[in-house]
């Protein structure tokens, strides 16, 4: 497909999403390093929608970093705060929302997302994830002697739950603009299918 045709298609798809999304929140789920925030910002910009990062919102309300919250209160308390913040954000749609890696594991959070949003699993293989997270030091779950082993365990635990998301998108070592355009395409097709089903 030529560049012009791709741009025309992308424009049509963004218009479709804006028309059909209503007040729903586009919720990106997946492991740390999958690119939820990077892709989410790009998609929000393309759709002219607000972008929110759940971890950033948590840090704002708590006045602590995610790493500090983990250390001070433990993962259980952090997940409870995370759930409450996400439930509040789901009331503010339409927007694009990137969630923390563990957020979708909470059944109550998943149910709320299913009701008020469209969940999209941003997937990536282990090598891509490790290459990305190695650039950052603020990953409390990876602060040990075997971060690759921890990441593999997280994949084993979480991927079956992430697979419950309505839509799936595989990322790879590709420009964020390309992945964002693929997400737009998948989301537009999903909304059109939903509209056709409700009309039928």
UniProtKB/Swiss-Prot annotation:
ATP binds at residues 33-38, 139. InterPro entries: P-loop_NTPase, Shikimate/glucono_kinase, Shikimate_kinase/TSH1. Belongs to the shikimate kinase family. PANTHER family: SHIKIMATE KINASE (PTHR21087), SHIKIMATE KINASE 1, CHLOROPLASTIC (PTHR21087:SF16). One of its GO terms (biological process) is amino acid biosynthetic process. Pathway: Metabolic intermediate biosynthesis; chorismate biosynthesis; chorismate from D-erythrose 4-phosphate and phosphoenolpyruvate: step 5/7. Its EC number is 2.7.1.71. It is found in: Cytoplasm. This is Shikimate kinase. Its main location: cytoplasm. It catalyses: shikimate + ATP = 3-phosphoshikimate + ADP + H(+). CDD domains: SK (cd00464). Its cofactor is Mg(2+). It comes from Brucella canis (strain ATCC 23365 / NCTC 10854 / RM-666). SUPFAM superfamilies: P-loop containing nucleoside triphosphate hydrolases. Mg(2+) binds at residue 37. It comes from the Bacteria. GO terms for cellular component: cytosol. Binds 1 Mg(2+) ion per subunit. Catalyzes the specific phosphorylation of the 3-hydroxyl group of shikimic acid using ATP as a cosubstrate. One of its GO terms (molecular function) is ATP binding. Substrate binds at residues 55, 79, 101, 158. Keywords: Amino-acid biosynthesis, Aromatic amino acid biosynthesis, ATP-binding, Cytoplasm, Kinase, Magnesium, Metal-binding, Nucleotide-binding, Transferase. Pfam families: SKI. Monomer.
